Each structure stands twice: as C-alpha cells, then as structure tokens.
Swiss-Prot record:
Self-association and partners: Heterodimer of a large and a small subunit.
Catalytic residue list: 114
Free-text function comment from the UniProt entry: Provides the precursors necessary for DNA synthesis. Catalyzes the biosynthesis of deoxyribonucleotides from the corresponding ribonucleotides.
Pfam families: Ribonuc_red_sm
Organism encoding this protein: Encephalitozoon cuniculi (strain GB-M1)
Catalytic activity: a 2'-deoxyribonucleoside 5'-diphosphate + [thioredoxin]-disulfide + H2O = a ribonucleoside 5'-diphosphate + [thioredoxin]-dithiol
Name listed for the protein in its UniProt record: Ribonucleoside-diphosphate reductase small chain
Record carries keyword Ion transport: no
Family: Belongs to the ribonucleoside diphosphate reductase small chain family.
C-alpha cells in the first residue's frame, strides 16, 4: 500500500475484522447479497440442441465462436488471478471480501462453462487444445490477456487505477463478444450458448458495478480513468473489427465499434467521468442487456435466476448506478 493509500478505509488494516455483524458497509453488503442471489451452475445449461445447431453454422461462424470462447475461457482465470493475488488481499473491508470470495466462485463457474462449450463443440483434439491454450496460441487473445496481466503485475499503479483497469476487463473486453453471441440468439441458434451468455453477462455486469462502487468509496480516485478506459476501447475495437471481425457472423464492424464506445461511455459515467465518445447504442437487441449500469434484465429462470428471498432486506440504497441513458 502506497503512502497515499494509507488513509483509504477500504485498504486500512484497522478495518480488518473476522465477524460480519454488525454490517458497516451496507451498500457493499447489498451488492454481495445481489451476487449471492444470482448463483447458478453449468448443470442448469442444456447443450443438446447446440450440437445440431453447430453443424448448421458455416466455417466462418464456427471460427468466430471458437475464438470468442477461447478468449472467455482464458480471461476468467486471469480475473481470478487478480482477485487472489491482489484485490482480495489489499481490500480489508469484510463486506468487500465477501463479494470477492463469491466472485471467485462465480468466475470458476464461468471458466467451467466456457471449457465445456469448447469441449462440446470442437471434436478435433488438436484444435481443442489449441483453443484451450489461446493466450499462447492466438495473438489477438494474447494481446488482451497481456493487457490484463500487466495490471496484475504492476507494482507502481495504485489500487484505484488497477480497479478501473479490471472494470475495463470485465466491462469493455467482454462487451463486444457478449453482443456478438446475443446476435446469434436473434437467429434462434445455439440456445445453450446464448442462455449461458445471458447468465455470464449479468454476472460480469454486476462485477463491473462492484468495481464502480468500490471506486466511489475511495477518497483518492483514479486520475487516469479516461486514459485507461480509452486504451481498453482501442484494444477491443481492434479485436472485433480486425483480429476477429464480427462480419464473420454477419454483424457490422463499424456498429460494433460504436457499441463498444457506448459501453465505455456508460462505464466512464459510473466512475464519475464525462462521456468521451457520446455514442448511442446501435444494437436494439442489447437495449436491456448492457454490462454497465443495467443489471435488471433477468425476469425469467430460463432467465429467472435470482434465488428466492436472498437479498431481501430493509434500508435505502446509498449508491445507485442503474441510471437509464
């Protein structure tokens, strides 16, 4: 912890405690209960129809989905590495540690889901192993992974800056790929893939909101928010318009770039900054499914995955980041 971080309550060893009650940070605790109510397992996702649908896709579509899944499978492990090695040890507030502990379990489920999807769709073992090792074998995936790992290994940047960086990993690096899978849903294809995408995108939206909430609690905010966000945006735009262009599945690359800018603007506002891109959402099918600022799109347990009675409590919200734009 740097000298400037010594006064941060979130990082202050004096805040460390082993008994939960009484709750001290009610907004952080409420976010944990929201995550807890959204627990799911891979056994709830049926892939039976996906196997038939996979054969209906053309070679470009299969290539695109395979590479997106390869990125996702690697990225959840990277997020967990950061939680284990950095955030969960740096943050001393117990309510936040509860959230991080639960997030690690959820990221494990995501990783299991993506690995299972690859294992189900890809029959050739060499291709399967190539995809499982994507951060070494696929340059475009490696570039995104390297960006995230750089922040884990960074010993000079303060907690606030690294918090923003991982909000970008979960809020921006995932956004375009999530949208591309929802695009397939419009065609009525791959119901297992698209359902798991709904579950995972909601989880990641909540994780991104949590990062914004912790940043809100910091006395010393990150002074490089726009720089970090814009850097992530450029990497993501390159990934989905050049390295793995979405036109492989019939999407418009320019519209995808605008969508990434739209998501970035919302993240910036949730971090207390002005918009940079002033982008509108070009995808009507993503209106109610956005990673940042809207996590209330789950109304059915084919999407209805909130556990009964979990998270019901009295009290007012002290922090809101669900503003509609």
């Amino acid at each position: 912890m740097s000298h400037g971080e010594e006064t941060e309550l979130l990082l202050d060893p004096k805040e460390e405690r082993f008994v939960l009650l009484p709750i001290k940070y009610h907004d952080i605790w409420k976010m944990y209960k929201k995550a807890e109510s959204s627990f799911w397992t891979v056994e709830e996702v049926s892939l039976d129809k996906d196997i038939d649908d996979w054969g209906k896709l053309n070679a470009k579509e299969r290539h695109f989905i395979s590479y997106v899944l390869a990125f996702f499978a690697a990225s959840d492990g990277i997020v967990n590495l950061n939680l284990v090695e950095r955030f969960s040890t740096e943050v001393k507030v117990l309510e936040a540690r509860f959230f991080y502990g639960f997030q690690m379990a959820i990221e494990n489920i995501h990783s299991e889901m993506y690995s299972l999807l690859i294992d189900t769709y890809i029959r050739d073992n060499d291709e399967k192993n190539f995809l499982f090792d994507a951060i070494r074998t696929i340059p475009s995936v490696k570039e995104k992974a390297d960006w995230a790992i750089r922040w884990i290994e960074d010993k000079n940047s303060d907690f606030a800056t690294r918090l923003v960086a991982f909000a970008c990993v979960e809020g921006i690096f995932f956004s375009g790929a999530f949208a591309s899978i929802f695009w397939l849903k419009k065609r009525g294809l791959m119901p297992g893939l698209t359902f798991s995408n709904e579950l995972i995108s909601r989880d990641e939206g909540l994780h991104c909101e949590f990062a914004c909430l912790l940043h809100y609690h910091l006395k010393k905010k990150c002074n490089r928010i726009k720089e970090v966000v814009m850097d992530a945006v450029e990497i993501e735009k390159k990934f989905l318009s050049e390295s793995l262009p979405v036109n492989l599945i019939g999407m418009n690359c320019n519209l995808m770039c605008r969508y990434i800018e739209f998501v970035a603007d919302r993240l910036l506002e949730n971090l207390g900054e002005e918009r940079v891109y002033n982008a509108t959402n070009p995808f009507d099918f993503m209106e109610n499914i956005s990673l940042v600022g809207k996590t209330n799109f789950f109304d059915k347990r084919e999407s209805q995955y909130q556990k009964a009675f979990v998270g019901i409590e009295n009290g007012n919200d002290s922090f809101r980041i669900d503003v509609d734009f």
